[in-house]
Amino acid sequence: MWYLNRGGGLDMNVIPAWMEGITGKGAVVTILDDGLEKDHPDLVQNYDPLASYDVNGQDSDPSPRYDMIDSNRHGTRCAGEVAATSNNSVCALGVAHGAQVGGVRMLDGDVTDAVEARSLSLNPHHIDIYSASWGPDDDGKTVDGPGELATRAFIEGVTKGRNGKGSIFIWASGNGGRDHDNCNCDGYTNSIYSLSISSATEHGHVPWYSEACSSTLASTYSSGAVGERQVVTTDLRHSCTSSHTGTSASAPLAAGICALALEANPNLTWRDMQHIVVRTARPQNLIAPDWQTNGVGRNVSHSFGYGLMDAYAMVQLARNWITVPEQHKCEIPAPHLLKPIPAKSVVVLQLQVKECEGVEVLEHVQAKLTIFSQRRGDLNIQLTSPMGTRVTLLAHRAHDNSRSGFNVWPFMSVHSWGESPFGTWQLEIHNDGRLLGRATLQNWSLVMYGSKQFLPTASHNGDPIRISKNKTFNKKKNKNKIKNKHSSKLITTTRLPKIQNKSKFKPNNPGLTNKKESISNKKDSNIISSKNKHLVNSTNSSNKNKTPLISTTTTDVSPYFYAVSNSNPIQKIKLDQDSVRQYLKFVKNITITYPIMIPSRDAVKTYNTFKNNQKLKEKSRDINTSRNVKVTLQKTTEVPTVKTTAQKGSLGK
């Protein structure tokens, strides 16, 4: 299990959490898939019948349907990654081997809106984490998402699940990289309610199947090209496998890591978990051409999100976490327009945001667009925040010949996490169509989710830091609240500017080989602690005022902290630790960001071509590079059919 025990920053830092007795005990994880072999010797001890159901067969037994090719092995494989039992000399060891695991059999039949909704809403006060490694077809031309019932299940889950703390939905980002797919066209991974997880190969490269998009939050290890190691887990008929693959394998690893964090702090909300992932994910040793530093100093990539999940760092931060303030939302519509976008041209729109009640620190940003297009795949959409963070909401999709366009589609980005919403946002829509390939933007709006400023960490002995109302971050400014206080500027040109589209990683591009860049990472977990390994157990309160600020992770950090002023223009200020301590006493108009990390950069490795002749509507998300086969589960009223003579898990999410 190379992805758990390599050391040197080349694994997900799980073993240090185990050494402190954190195994996921008390957490309940359910795998939404094609069934679960509940009597598997590596799963039976941790199997939870209250977290299981057969939606396809309408009974309480989630056992998979067996056939000659073991086509329903996918869910059992995912479950073993989460909670395979320890010390039994069977297959493997689950990331959260102390957690309870269940399965929902829902992919082995008609995958309707009602089936999805029932699966997503199973026993929400008992189940903590739902892990899903499936989604719409990753063919580079499909745009699809949850229906009305499933959307309602998501909302009910995050608002009422876990007795109000919110269900945690982990989703595989997709395997459409070979077809230049974009996971922002997948309404499940594009949802603010899901924690979207991508993959990294054992050498830290972007896998050939990976989809790049701005909604990916973080990554875990999985398979790569031929010859690179894959994931070890349980398999059907009480057997084992060392060839679980794709983003299908990444999502359950993330679910297991989140279960560890829940044992450390069962009171974490669904938004707390996303904040902790953002603040602890490690970008170093992950190689991608599009790493950038956002407006508050966090490194982020369309391929890896904020980096590789770090289990021990998440556990440490969770122990001292103070629940984030209530989520607020505001929508800023652009003035009504019906703007043509001729072929070979770009339209640039600016939207001034002067007011967004309750949102001072951004989490998710959505750009809702209605666009008609002669060819949807010719569109490229980019959004730039007031703090300069530029994201690709949609990259060109060569296989997308649809004329349907987008109807109020919510393109989502997490790249501005922690930034201020105020200022000028810029939307660029590029149309690379042929002479008659015209497009028309009917309307668009920005939807911003976030909260007021907060300090979400606790003191070194586990007691919460109390900050009086007159010492909160970013004191409220006196301002006149005027509805619809925004403006829009329109700039149009028929000449297509020279741009560099970095949203889609193409590992077979020789121009990327041996490219080296230095990327700083300002880790943002400001925990006050005497030692990094004793965040909770320390009881020496006499040194409380002498304790320096350090990162929760075990990686190297610089001694410098930064602040961002609320002045106009915004300024970045370097602080030493003494200044930070003084700052905590007189918090007013600046916001602390975090210490710098410099990740190593290596040569980008090309990938071997993998042939794929089948197209799916609904499928699992795992890849087997040794067998060119696929099985499909139709999201229609048709009976699912076997497209080849191999197992379903061989190709998909």
Could you tell me what each predicted segment is?
Residues 174, 300-379, 440-516, 522-523, ...:
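Secreted peptidase-domain scaffold signal
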Residues 419-429:
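Noncatalytic modules at the cell exterior or secretory-pathway interfaces
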Residues 122, 127-131, 166-167, 193-196, ...:
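C-terminal subdomain of the subtilisin-like protease fold in secreted/lumenal serine endopeptidases
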Residues 380-384:
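Beta-strand signatures of extracellular beta-sandwich domains
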Residues 428-436:
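Short beta-strand-plus-loop segments that form exposed binding edges in beta-rich domains
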Residues 33, 186-263, 267:
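Extracellular S/T/G-rich loop segment that most often corresponds to the catalytic His/Ser-adjacent loop
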Residues 16-24, 68-72, 93-96, 110-132, ...:
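Mature extracellular/periplasmic domains of secretome proteins
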Residues 11-14, 26-27, 31-39, 45-156, ...:
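Subtilisin-like peptidase catalytic core
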